[in-house]
Amino acid sequence: MKRQLTLAQYRSVDLTLFAVILAVCEYVITLAAIRWFPGQLYTVSLTAALCAIVLMRWGAWAGLHAVLGGAVFWFASGGTPQQLVIYGIGNLGCLLVLPLLRGNGKEKIRRDKLFTALFALAVLLAMQLGRAAVALLLGTPWQTCVGFFTTDALSGVFAMVVVSLAGRLDGVFEDQKRYLHRLQEQQKKEKGGF
């Protein structure tokens, strides 16, 4: 007899897989940028893209990935304790986009390619806003905080592309409760059930 996962077990496995993907990719990307392009003003990060996907799939659980992405970036770049706070806590700014997902928001964002790309960009901008706010609270000059928006510009394009591609794959950029329900309905139809 097949043993099915509970929703909580499925969510735990799903969140863990996305966390591992995020940690490995962010670490490699950060090390590559530091070693191969040390003088570059721009950075690329996968954190916003994966947080946008997890926000769509599980909502506020994406906060775990936001903090993880900041911590991995901090660790790989050899940052200061203050930078850990700025990136770890500041990335939680991505949760500011949660109101966009209420009601029919998830479906509208998921189904419309423009809204999908704009959602990914909104997640990145909210993270940058969070980092800037935390940095300002820690006494960082505002001119330095502007750098959170300018140096991460490529990450915005990257996030829009990654999330748009994820939207083309069945169930990847979709609320998982809805996705599992949809799969269950399809299986019933295929078996000739009600």
What are these regions (language model features)?
Residues 53-67:
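Membrane-helix interface "capping/anchor" motifs
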Residues 65-86:
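Membrane-helix boundary elements
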